[in-house]
């Protein structure tokens, strides 16, 4: 049986070297028969303590690519250089912009639709970029860092009010960086269409207690189902 997708290790050039690096690593997921069909693409950015090999991002890429979506997950420079401290926001934004640009290198195979987002910090970088430099069909946040851990009064929401694309928030009830009641109040004030999906008992990394009887794979499947259905709705499917 022929595979439904292929996955290619790629290098994403950086205009300016960071940590002595001239490029960062990425994995491009190419669906069977691409670029036929709706030509939808999804770019997945990792969080502050992760990398492109975050198990959730790997699982999402595998499943979405098999569902005929062009996908890309990649390293920010600090992860590529195995540094623990994230790069300054301008560096992160440039890297995400370069990653997105790789999808359109071949105009004959460029996607017609773009969705960007990711885990924690990666989602925040996507939000920053979407307000000024990149046009996307939608943004998704897998654990949005709404405020510093345990300090809900110190909100980081200015960028959300400038976004016009639809947004999906997937949040765990035990995420100390995003209290659900505070997020709900914030989203009421956001002008763009928003969708919130809450995962009971999940923390910022979407881990759930053993008592729930749910495995990491169960949670990953739930997130995939929500993300896939949301993309379909945004595209009018």
Where are these regions (language model features)?
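Serine-hydrolase catalytic machinery in alpha/beta-hydrolase-like enzymes
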Residues: 10-113, 206-216
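Short beta-strand immediately N-terminal to the catalytic nucleophile in serine-hydrolase-like folds
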Residues: 113-118, 142
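Gly/Ala-rich beta-loop-alpha elbow adjacent to hydrolase catalytic centers
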Residues: 118-122, 126
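A conserved short beta-strand
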Residues: 135-147
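Short beta-strand/loop motif that positions the catalytic acidic residue
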Residues: 162-164, 169-171, 175
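Acidic catalytic loop of the alpha/beta-hydrolase fold
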Residues: 173-178, 204-205
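Catalytic histidine neighborhood in serine/cysteine hydrolases
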Residues: 190-208
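Catalytic active-site module of serine/aspartate enzymes centered on a nucleophile-bearing elbow/loop
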Residues: 210-237
């Amino acid at each position: 049986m022929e595979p439904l997708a292929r996955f290619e290790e790629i290098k994403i050039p950086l205009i300016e070297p960071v940590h002595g690096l001239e490029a960062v690593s990425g994995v491009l997921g190419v669906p069977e028969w691409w670029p036929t069909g709706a030509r939808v693409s999804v770019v997945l950015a990792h969080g502050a303590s992760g990398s492109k090999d975050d198990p959730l991002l790997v699982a999402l890429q595998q499943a979405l690519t098999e569902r005929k979506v062009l996908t890309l997950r990649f390293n920010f420079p600090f992860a590529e250089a195995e540094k623990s401290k994230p790069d300054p926001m301008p560096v992160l934004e440039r890297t995400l912009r370069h990653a997105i640009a790789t999808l359109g290198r071949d105009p004959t195979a460029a996607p017609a639709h773009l969705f960007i987002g990711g885990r924690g910090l990666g989602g925040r970088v996507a939000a920053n970029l979407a307000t000024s430099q990149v046009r996307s069909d939608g943004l998704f946040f897998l654990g949005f860092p709404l405020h510093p851990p345990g300090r809900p009064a110190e909100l980081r929401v200015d960028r959300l009010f400038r976004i016009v694309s639809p947004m999906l928030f997937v949040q765990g009830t035990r995420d100390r960086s995003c209290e659900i009641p505070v997020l709900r109040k914030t989203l009421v004030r956001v002008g763009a269409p928003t969708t919130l999906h809450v995962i009971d008992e999940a923390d910022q990394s979407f881990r759930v207690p053993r008592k729930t009887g749910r495995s990491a794979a169960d949670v990953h499947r739930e997130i995939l189902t929500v993300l896939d259905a949301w993309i379909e709705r945004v595209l009018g499917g």
